Amino acid sequence: IGFIGTGKITTSVITGLFRSKANLKQILISERSKKNSRALAKRLKQVKVVKDNQEIINRSNWVVLAVVPTVAKKILQDLKFKKGQTVISFVSTLNMKDLRRFASPATLVFKAAPLPMVESKLGPIVLYPSNNKVNALFNKIGTVINAKNEKENNYLWTLTAGMATYLELCATLENWLVQRKVNTAKAKRLVTSLVFGLSHTLLLSKQDTRSLVREYQTKKGINEELLLRLKKDKVFDKINKNLNTIFARIKKANDQ
């Protein structure tokens, strides 16, 4: 398997694959970025840095495209793929039509959206279209969520924009305590335990999430009060509105 582009996501995916003990004899990675590629090659003996992107394609059965969106088309237009190769793109703004055109004559072409936590074998991985072998590989490092079509794929990718916002909420809760002289480590431990407990509840519960929202508040209790205050301030309406804006951006990029 070869990776063209060695940023944070590529580093996380490769780290997760080795932690999952995936049977990969060799992983070829591009030199860009030099810092990440050298660190991976130094840490993992199966990883080899290759200076030329075309050489990665020539030597790989599976090719992962993980370059930044702004240069993706420029890089891909000069590359030649092979019939029978599996080509997987991590590029959010590259639509399937263009991807298939660039990857031709390869016909096994996919879009995937792994997130940084895959290095710990956690988190969703949006994948389109579904394929047993590709699903099996990515299920080793996360939870594959297959989109039924490209429109749904765009919807699912939109939700991945919520990572930093979720962490900002956690940071806000922590900082509220720290500002009131609570020890920083203690504040983080409380918030981390709270988030873990809620995530575990969501994972195991057979109820829909809206039912859990009702269950986790009592009449005239503090959970009900904070939720009602945030609703009155239209916090959740604003999140919904801005998700629509993010979706429009992804859709526009994929329609080009």
Q: Where are these predicted regions, by residue range?
A:
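NAD(P)+-binding Rossmann beta1-loop-alpha1 motif at the extreme N-terminus of oxidoreductases
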Residues: 1-51, 55, 178-179
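Rossmann-like NAD(P)-binding element
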Residues: 35, 47-48, 53-86
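NAD(P)-dependent Rossmann-like dehydrogenase/reductase catalytic/cofactor-binding core
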Residues: 192, 196-256
